[in-house]
């Protein structure tokens, strides 16, 4: 297993686009020219970790923890302190991992959250731990001051869409996802305008999940992006007897 794990790690690295990384062991302590990575690749790996397993931040954000070490000779309590000093020294820092070797020097992959943004800062090759954390804090400061995000948390209610030749007269609609727009370079997002684009009517059959239209987001006349509007339920095409029944209903109700 010890020999097989680096093979799997290298395969996974390729899947993540870590093209400048090669693992020769599973602990990262090999002092070899064939065992290497880059800050960009560490950032890709870290992003994959916190996106797939966000609960890791519940643990990496702990500054101190009381641990009980149990052996055959008995148990002994001791205090475990986080090696990531940014947890206590930088507001919003919630992780992630420090590391150091004689060849790599002092390294850290740090995560911080502020104003609905999550930032990753990776530092490698620092001469000491103070420089490592100072550089990471500077990267955070630059990132948070340069970026802002718009999230549409107050989505407008969607109308029901008229359906022709369907067993139902209308179709339910729903948003495909929550709209988010990231502005970089210090750009300030102005007032956002939303426009719902839908046809006046559609013909059955309709399948749940198919695209019905979209919502377009603009600020200062520039389009920020859009989100698809999907059908929220199936609408089957009406048969002859369905149409006959509908006609008779309209006749007796005086709407035909």
Identify the role of each PLM range.
Residues 8-9, 82:
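Generic structural signal for hydrophobic residues
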Residues 2-5:
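Short, small-residue-biased leader/transition segments that mark boundaries at the very start
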Residues 27-33:
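Conserved short loop/turn motifs at secondary-structure junctions
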Residues 10-19:
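Glycine-rich, acidic and aromatic/proline-enriched surface loops and short helix-turn segments
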Residues 18, 22, 33-256:
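Domain-terminus/edge residues, biased toward the C-terminal soluble/receptor-binding domains
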């Amino acid at each position: 297993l010890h020999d097989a794990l680096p093979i799997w790690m290298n395969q996974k690295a390729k899947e993540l686009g870590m093209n400048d990384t090669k693992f020769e062991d599973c602990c990262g302590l090999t002092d070899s020219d064939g065992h290497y990575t880059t800050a960009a690749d560490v950032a890709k790996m870290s992003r994959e970790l916190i996106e797939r397993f966000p609960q890791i931040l519940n643990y990496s954000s702990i500054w101190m923890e009381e641990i009980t070490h149990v052996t055959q000779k008995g148990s002994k309590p001791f205090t475990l302190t986080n090696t990531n000093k940014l947890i206590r020294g930088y507001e919003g820092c919630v992780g992630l991992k420090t590391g150091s070797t004689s060849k790599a020097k002092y390294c850290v992959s740090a995560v911080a959250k502020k104003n609905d943004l999550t930032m990753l800062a990776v530092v490698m090759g620092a001469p000491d731990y103070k420089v490592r954390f100072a550089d990471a804090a500077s990267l955070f400061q630059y990132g948070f001051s340069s970026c802002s995000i718009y999230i549409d948390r107050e989505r407008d209610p969607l109308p029901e869409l008229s359906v022709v030749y369907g067993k139902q007269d209308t179709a339910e609609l729903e948003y495909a996802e929550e709209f988010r727009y990231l502005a970089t370079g210090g750009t300030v997002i102005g007032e956002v305008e939303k426009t719902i684009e839908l046809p006046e009517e559609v013909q059955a059959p309709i399948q749940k999940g198919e695209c019905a239209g979209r919502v377009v987001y603009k600020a200062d006349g520039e389009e920020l992006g859009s989100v698809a509007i999907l059908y929220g339920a199936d609408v089957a095409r009406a048969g002859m007897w369905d149409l006959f029944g509908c006609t008779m209903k309209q006749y007796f109700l005086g709407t035909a």
